[in-house]
């Protein structure tokens, strides 16, 4: 054993990149998710040929800047399903030592969604009040996020969110956690670098309507990750994703893909599948609680003309 411990591999380091503020937050939240939450995952695979045909019709005759994206339509489909399944649009507060818990459902559907910004950065943004938005509103909201991101210092935005979360933890008596986070983020060689002096003053002089703020990045009521928008030729499914506490559910969406369809007359044709992955916190929900969501998704794909009413 001692000989094994003394063995060293000759490896050439290509790159060593220490965590920035965005990766720090992701690492912290996902680690907490797997530590605290009993995940249950189910998939729903509606046949999407007619749905995609109607989606194409939706954009006929529209100028490029007016076209509705598939991402916007999928977000609307999910939002309508969440209206019928409010149990998924909720937060949980559970104290394991006392075995006490409470699940709080919300009327507002605020979707946390990872987005690939024009800068190439991945950022999870909070799409507020989706329950009131039409397809056109959702399209405009997504475009506005990209517009404001161009004027935003993402490290500063993430630091503002992290600091606010840390101070909330202090208010709840989490002294050790608060001190540890402050030491980890603001001391040492690899501390988080934020704006200061003139740069900071000039940055915060940009109107909030023209840049992203902590309001845009704060915790939503549920997470939706459209992985298919990142890899449109992906021939696979999202097998699992993290629930971000205190949320009780997360939804992953793949890319439309070819699949064999067995017809009633015994013939087989090529169709399209769009896979929805639904992950829920078993402390808060059982399978029966998410069935209304799954049924709503199925209904929309069976009768896709409804999406024309959502414009």
Question: Where are the regions a protein language model picked out?
Answer:
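C-terminal catalytic/motor cores of large multi-domain enzyme assemblies
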Residues: 1-311
